[in-house]
Swiss-Prot record:
Subcellular location field: Cytoplasm
Gene: rimP
Lineage per the UniProt record: Bacteria, Pseudomonadati, Pseudomonadota, Betaproteobacteria, Burkholderiales
UniProt function note: Required for maturation of 30S ribosomal subunits.
Annotated family: Belongs to the RimP family.
Cytoplasm keyword on record: yes
UniProt protein name: Ribosome maturation factor RimP
CDD domains for this protein: YlxS_C
The organism's place on the tree of life at top rank: Bacteria
């Protein structure tokens, strides 16, 4: 069987849809997570579902149910393009190795800075982009953690949501 992620990504080419994840779950569920720059609408999910149903049938992909949805407000970040896209947003990262006894950090993501002389991004070693994370180490003590994608175990958006709404 072909790589399911690659097959799905190819099927969505030209649809202005970003494939975030393809996951097999219990009882034959195939869960496909998509995103768009301007947000995922129900019509996008319907269109992707119809397209993938046809492709999966032709390719003999075994599943009982297909679920297509958005990654939600706490979407995972998995590659450099996603980290660059969400620079300036609040994220949470978990490091592979603890730093000062701590692995999980939340703060504002910084994109790699361009070197004034060469116009190239900061890199660590073999051309790996170095991102920054502004976080509050102690009250009113903002620090910046520098990291590459190899340094992290996982990352996700970590927005601050206001559920208070309007008062009556």
């Amino acid at each position: 069987m072909a790589d399911l992620f690659a097959l799905t990504e190819e099927a969505l080419a030209g649809m202005d849809i970003e494939l975030v994840d393809v996951e097999r779950a219990a009882m034959g569920l195939l869960r496909v997570t998509i995103d768009r720059v301007d947000g995922v609408r129900i019509e996008d999910c319907e269109q992707v579902s119809r397209q993938l149903s046809h492709v999966y049938e032709v390719e003999n992909i075994d599943y009982k149910r297909l679920e297509v949805g958005s990654p939600g407000v706490d979407r995972p970040l998995r590659n450099e393009a996603e980290f660059r896209r969400f620079a300036g947003e609040r994220i949470e990262i978990k490091l592979r190795e603890a730093l000062d006894g701590r692995k999980v950090f939340s703060g504002t993501l910084r994109a790699p800075e361009a070197d004034g002389a060469s116009g190239q991004d900061d890199t660590a070693g073999a051309g790996k982009a170095v991102f920054g994370l502004e976080f509050e180490a102690k009250k009113n003590d903002i620090q910046v953690l520098s990291f590459t994608l190899d340094d992290i175990e996982r990352a996700k958006l970590d927005p601050v949501l206001d559920f208070k709404g309007k008062k009556r």
